[in-house]
Amino acid sequence: MTDPIATSSTAAKELLDMDGRASEQRLIQLRIRQQQERAVKELRDAIGIHQCKKGIFCLVKQSKISYEITATDHRLSYELGPQRQKFTCMVGINPIVITQQSGDTKGCIQCSCDSTECIYTLLKTLCGLRDLLPMN
């Protein structure tokens, strides 16, 4: 009786030998795609568990976020749609209404570390971004 694992391993090796570089390229692309899919899942999970005192007003919850891992760095890109604020106050007996609108905001936070836990630090940085760089 033949060993099925050895047979499949031999068959895979023969396929690799027959196809050569094309198979290597496909395997590399497959690994890169799997790494990107893991990064997207990790991002979704990290956003889901993020909690702060700002609640739904936190930039982490309001922004459209993407996470990229390259050979040398990590990049968290964010996009925030237009926002509108309305404020009413009384001056004497007359109400004054102040309306403010801002356009799209896009940016990225980038680091060049080799930590696998970097996503959480980048999300915390995005969360506190309004405190660091007040936009309005």
From Swiss-Prot:
Is Acetylation one of the keywords? no
Q: Which GO terms are recorded in the biological process aspect for this UniProt protein?
A: symbiont-mediated perturbation of host defense response; symbiont-mediated suppression of host apoptosis
Pfam families per record: Adeno_E3_15_3
UniProt KW Amino-acid biosynthesis keyword: no
Sections of the chain in a coiled coil: none
Q: What does this protein do?
A: Protects virus-infected cells from TNF-induced cytolysis.
The protein depicted here goes by the name Early E3 15.3 kDa protein
